[in-house]
């Protein structure tokens, strides 16, 4: 019989609204025996059943909910339903040649990410309770893809994020099943990329910016473009493929720059798109001092904060990078700026960019606001699923 977790009085509103997490400070009592990773029943303070989830006393996220139905068996049939729904959603909303097939809590499979790069799957498991289901879900996903004529060539696990330690889990990296060539060529928005699922960041590629990159193609045509924190050259190459006159990509990682140059070669853009290894925060003032100006500046920095407590310092970081970027935009040019931190809200990022514009005597005209691609769905009951904010502005000098 499953252990029963009873919440404190007044807690459980997030769960009732459809959220997935129960934190350690929300729990009143736990009745019955359990091991970490086990499925438990969750009740509110008055004993009303709220659903089932897996428990982990090593984590502040004590329970991750799997279902609101206490009579629901968490078995292969249940997992098959979740996987099928996730794949059907992607087929409806995005180009599925390369996409995020499972996005954790937003697909009601908390703690699990699966990315598809053509015929390769990359798995990231961030929750102890999901470990027991991981390989079953991979098997079910392969079956689901096969129904659409997609044969999976190989599966690689990239469960090597620091979040694993918060769950009391070791970092894991390696093949699930037979070994295979882990270099995969994908095509997105007309651009070819070599994705290294073993050594690339996260699962090898940032799929969440897919349609934001596409949105920049129109703006970059015929323009001089600076792409900061370029990583594998994604925004820079979208600019190049759209007909930008000259594109420079900057990244601090030598490996990333090597990959970006290889991607430029694959697309025949070596003469137009150039990459340099540089610390962006140091390089932008040097470019400004030398008199460089660009029609388009793209700022896609790593997350400056991964916790609420670090938000204050993150604001300073975003303000600094946007000030430095704005100084390089020609009058009438364009700035694309974003944050991939959940804790940097849309309102907070907008306020920070507005302050940067004021500090540089620039006026901003918003072209559009965008967020993560639909294969990274935002579950309104789970705030943590909304993390990417992407602004495009026209930049006008004060006159």
Predicted segments with their positions:
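Short, surface-exposed beta-strand-loop junctions and turns on beta-sheet-rich folds
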Residues: 59, 129-131, 201-202
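S-adenosylmethionine
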Residues: 3-53, 127, 176-178, 184, ...
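A short, charged
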Residues: 77, 81, 85-89, 93, ...
């Amino acid at each position: 019989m499953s252990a029963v977790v009873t919440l404190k009085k007044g807690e459980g509103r997030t769960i009732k609204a459809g959220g997935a997490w129960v934190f350690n400070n929300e729990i009143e009592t736990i009745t019955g025996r359990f091991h970490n990773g086990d499925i438990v029943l969750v009740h509110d303070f008055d004993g009303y059943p709220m659903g089932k989830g897996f428990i982990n006393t090593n984590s502040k996220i004590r329970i991750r909910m799997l279902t609101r139905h206490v009579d629901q068996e968490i078995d292969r049939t249940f997992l098959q339903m979740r996987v099928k729904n996730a794949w059907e959603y992607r087929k409806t909303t995005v180009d599925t040649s390369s996409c995020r097939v499972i996005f954790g809590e937003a697909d009601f499979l908390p703690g699990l990410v699966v990315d598809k790069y053509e015929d390769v799957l990359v798995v990231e498991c961030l929750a102890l309770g999901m470990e027991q289901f991981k390989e079953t879900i991979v098997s079910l996903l392969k079956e689901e893809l096969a129904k659409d004529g997609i044969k999976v060539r190989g599966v690689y696990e990239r469960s090597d994020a620091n979040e694993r330690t918060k769950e009391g889990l070791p970092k894991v990296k390696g093949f699930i099943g037979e070994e295979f060539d882990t270099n995969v060529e994908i095509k997105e928005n007309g651009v070819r990329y070599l994705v290294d699922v073993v050594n690339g960041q996260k699962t090898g590629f940032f799929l969440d910016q897919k349609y934001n990159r596409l949105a920049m193609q129109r703006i970059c045509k015929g323009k001089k473009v600076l792409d900061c924190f370029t990583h594998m050259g994604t925004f820079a190459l979208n600019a190049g493929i759209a007909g930008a006159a000259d594109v420079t990509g900057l990244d601090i990682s030598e490996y990333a720059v090597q990959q970006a140059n290889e991607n430029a070669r694959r697309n025949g853009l070596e003469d137009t798109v150039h990459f340099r290894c540089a610390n962006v925060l140091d390089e932008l003032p040097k470019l400004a001092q030398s008199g460089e100006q660009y029609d388009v500046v793209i700022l896609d920095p790593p997350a400056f904060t991964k916790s609420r407590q670090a938000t204050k310092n993150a604001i300073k970081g975003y303000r600094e990078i946007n000030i430095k970027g704005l100084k390089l935009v020609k009058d009438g040019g364009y700035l694309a700026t974003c944050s991939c931190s959940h804790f940097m809200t849309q309102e907070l990022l907008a306020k920070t960019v507005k302050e940067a514009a004021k500090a540089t005597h620039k006026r901003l005209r918003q072209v559009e606001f965008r967020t993560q691609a639909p294969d990274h769905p935002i579950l309104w009951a789970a705030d943590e699923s909304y993390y990417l904010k992407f602004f495009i502005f026209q930049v006008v000098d004060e006159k």
